[in-house]
């Protein structure tokens, strides 16, 4: 297709692969101390992240992002937080923080905001890396 630029394409691909490998190593180091700890996410949007880095949420407050969780759902997750000694419940900036407060009230669980949209991140070539790094860093801070 474009043999004149083949060397540049291969170089760019190698650089991107090296950056991803480095990011994976960094994120694994960030997450290592909390691998066996229990956490709950606001909504079930992190399955690929969890699978890629060998972690697993104990549950999600909301089963989707289109509507607020019902009182029954909040009670169910709250019971799970208590029964499983969940240490962290993740909030998201675009959702009602009061819901997370209702889930953790009276428990020993901590909470922190995790931003899967990267709203406050600077657009540019490092956006994806920064987004993944921030997810890991903010999750680890919760413990």
Provide a role label for each language-model segment.
Residues 1-143:
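Extracytoplasmic metal-acquisition and chelation regions
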